[in-house]
Amino acid sequence: VFRATVKIAKHFSLIGGALIAGDSTKLRAQNSKKNNYNQDKIDRHVAYIDHKIEEYNNLLATADGDKKVEIEKAISKQTQRKELYKAIEQQIQETGQAQVSTSDPESRQMITRNNITEVAYNVQTTVDAKHCLPIDYKVTNNNDSKAMGEMLRRAKTILRTNEFTALYDKGYHTGSEMKIAHDLDITALVAIPDVASNAPDPQYNIANFLYDEQTNTYTCPEGNILSTNGSWYAKNRGKYRANVLVQQYKTSACKSCPKGNLCSKSFQKNGRVLERSEFAKYLDNNKINVESNKELYKKRQSIVEHPYGTIKRQWGFSYILTKKGKARASSDVGL
């Protein structure tokens, strides 16, 4: 139904195809938080059960008659609960997933707003700017960081062109996704998030180190040149995120720099070491595009946040009706 509606809208020129915006919204799944598990939650439950079993065993040593039978039943009940949690733990280990939902297996616990979490699906949506009409959506159980590339590919197929500009918020600011946009020859403007770690003095934040593409060097605010040995290093970003390749930049001038403690929290140990990822040039190009198209980017909210404002707040559709996985959830959203 949704695809047919988009085709009709295109036929009547209701879709402009020159400017689109992408965003996501969380829709609650038919799975309670109680029936969602990760390793930490399992560890807490198992530790509690082990403690209770130990208490029961201590009582069992002095119990007799009906009291003994009652305690043995309690131990059996706790043992069965432990086996259940161990089975879920094995599922987590075998699948490599961070969490398991037992009512709707493909739903995941996610942050919805202000650090409030819900077991939900994350619906990626592409909206055309001409009349704020959604042209595409995809029901996922992941966050936004790796979503933009695929949604741009789909938009290119739907619009049958790559001559459009796409607007996204900072949740989509990922180097590998910027590369996909570049490879598709699509102009994407993605908001730039705040730097995760700052220098003790903001004057020495990495944004104030000037990169020279010709020499592949950085110049620090004190005028010193940071260079690389040319080697690429795999940076570990955690169990559930792929490694990224980086080059490291440093200078021996750090040893005698009087501003060192203003520049780096670990200056006395290492001096200042900058890292530049394999995707840095795509992030740099995005920064230039965003800064030179500020008025255009301001349209993002009015384009993409309006449809779900209507759907969720006025129509009350904030949850998935079925608990049969992403495919059935996708049908719910499409209708």
Regions of interest found by a model, annotated:
Residues 1-335:
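Anion-binding and metal-coordination hotspots
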